[in-house]
Amino acid sequence: MKTKKLIVFLLLAYIPMMIVGFVIHKHAGGIDATSADANAIFAFLFSAGSMLIPLLAVVFTQLIFKEKVFDGCGVSLRFNRWWWIGWLLMPLMALVTFGVSLLMPGETLATDSEAVQQGLAQMGGAGLWGFIALSTFSGMLAGVTVNALFAFGEEVAWRGFLYKEFKGRKFLTAAVIIGVIWGFWHFPLILNGHNYPQHPVLGVFLMVLLCILLTPILMYFRKKSGTLIVPAIMHGTFNAVVGISNILVEPANDLLVGGPGLAGFIVLLLTNIGLLIYDHCCSREDIYLKEL
């Protein structure tokens, strides 16, 4: 990794993100996922659009250093079984996270919440499990389509550009560094109430931990599939289904419940351990333990 190149990329990725955070704070007063008023919609659209910032940072960094824009980033449409394995893993993790969330102190199933009641009313007699199934399936469809497109804007940077630049380093070392860069990149949104509305300052550091735990999983599938598209689909699907716990569990303490909470961290850690064991005992590639 060229230090000067990394600095240029970080400046191009972080400065526009800080501007986005300032604009959201100034014009919308923050991010409120529970509201549907004009300010909340503005904040949502602006924060969603910010996912394209890392893509632009990669493009301009490559142009500044006179290199091909997507050279070595792993953009390939060659399909293999790791595409659907990665896609299906995300809702499985979300459902396990939902179960673990219910085990957190003081958390219970939110069958009486307004969101759940509205969903159940729209589904007729399908019941709670039908609501969960439909929510999960809808999230999977969003994850492999529109969400994947936006996630690609980030993944070009994290699992494309940085993955390429950190080749030669130990897999887990690179994963931690990329996770830290990815996590802190979110700080303007976190301070505005994204993911951790109850604890925005502490949430900045929890988001870094979330990204550190999620990065090895996405990097593993990037390696196994041979394409950046798979982590983009996984990232998009994760974003789409990770909120199921926050809808179905109350009082939904953001430090405990859902993907960004303790429940999610436990599931991510177990998933990493599972992949490490599979990779060592079954595929015998030891990707987690070798260099990129």
Regions of interest found by a model, annotated:
Residues L6-M18, M51, I85-A94, I178-I181:
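Alpha-helical transmembrane segments
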Residues A13-G29, T97-L102:
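Alpha-helical transmembrane segments of multi-pass membrane proteins
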Residues I19-F65, V75, R81-P91, T111-L141, ...:
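Alpha-helical transmembrane segments in multi-pass membrane proteins
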Residues G21, L55-V59, F187-I190, N239-I244, ...:
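Hydrophobic transmembrane alpha-helices of multi-pass small-molecule transporters
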Residues F70-G74, A110-T111, S283-L292:
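Short, Lys/Arg-enriched, Gly/Pro-containing loop segments at transmembrane-helix junctions
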Residues F152-I181, K223-T227:
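Membrane-interface helix/loop boundary segments of multi-pass membrane proteins
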Residues A174-G183, V230-A240:
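Central hydrophobic cores of alpha-helical transmembrane segments
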Residues P200, M234-L292:
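C-terminal membrane module of polytopic membrane proteins
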